[in-house]
Amino acid sequence: MQVPFSVEARAVSLQEARSLYFGRGELPEALLDQNVLRSWERCRQAGLDPARLGGGEPDVRGVAEARERNRTLISHAQPVLEHLFEQIRNSHSMVILADARGMVLQSYGDADFLSRAEQVALRPGASWHEFERGTNAIGTALAERGAVNVFGSEHFFEGNAFLTCSASPIQDAQGRLMGVLDISSDYRAFQRHSLGLVKMSSRIIEKRLFESEFAHQGLLSFHARPDHVGSLCEALLAISPDGDLLGADQAALELLGLRREDLPRRHYSMLFDVPLGTLIDRARRDPSSLIAISGRNGERFYARLRGNFAPMSAAASALVDARGERLAGRPRQEAPVPAPADRLT
């Protein structure tokens, strides 16, 4: 869909979309992003009235309990929220952290915008689940399990049409929804880069959560581009000393063509050609260096292993890789020959 560039043109096209949808019962597919249209459909099926005020007052007691339930999320997200707000300060905006139920846990914002946001209960303790507040970035990001923009009159409730919001979900190391990061502002202050900012910031939080959960395991950082290892673009695998896969972030699943449910049936040696012992030895000798490895389907990656692995002998390395072959249901083969020196960078 080609979205008009100007705020004014977009506002006009959204009034046309609302007229078609709410006035004539037609689907304005050419005028709305599909995630917004799906949200409108969910809200209508739930019996929400676009003319009413959404939800109730913030739950002071409930937010205290929610913060306790989500203390791990908050501890890793707090510095990211503060840094993100510094980037958008003085732009008539606010930064919001909500939990997996859509309850606002924390917020930072410019005073002039916060006072207006409070008029629609966009503050800690309020639920912004779709069935409470209609289409909105927090609730819709949770429902869609993906990053979304909700601009002006794309909000289901007319009273929220002064907002423009960008939100990205936050997942834990097992792929479960933990919460949502959101930037909200007056729609007239719309910034195209807001969605990119929340996606990047949510990725930072997810990376912190993953590394914290597997802090005492081996962490394999890898990517097809060597300059992406150590950046937000890197993929992460958590590996036991025996080569079992303990966890994978979304980037790792995508690069390796795996589903999360595949992990318990996979072993390090089923994915890469370089023996785990070689990686461990390299990590002990030169922790900052990269090693070139190939996937079992021929993909070329660059990797760095972190963790407190004990030194592994060649015999132990062969046993680990042989165990992986047995898990794969294949006959035992000779242990892979370590990569030649010119592949180690």
Language-model region placement:
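Intrinsically disordered, low-complexity terminal regulatory regions
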Residues: 1-132, 136-152, 162, 171-242
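Short, solvent-exposed coil/turn linker segments
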Residues: 60, 126-130, 186, 259, ...
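Short linear motifs in intrinsically disordered
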Residues: 85-86, 226-229, 270, 277-284
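Surface loops and adjacent helix of pleckstrin homology
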Residues: 107-109, 153, 210, 248-250, ...
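Short, surface-exposed beta-strand-loop junctions and turns on beta-sheet-rich folds
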Residues: 111-113, 252-255, 309-310
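PAS-family sensory/regulatory modules and their coupling/dimerization elements
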Residues: 153-154, 162-167, 272-333
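Sensory coupling linkers of modular signal transduction proteins
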Residues: 181-214, 229, 303-345
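Signal-transducing coiled-coil/dimerization helices and immediately adjacent hinge/linker segments
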Residues: 208-274, 328-345
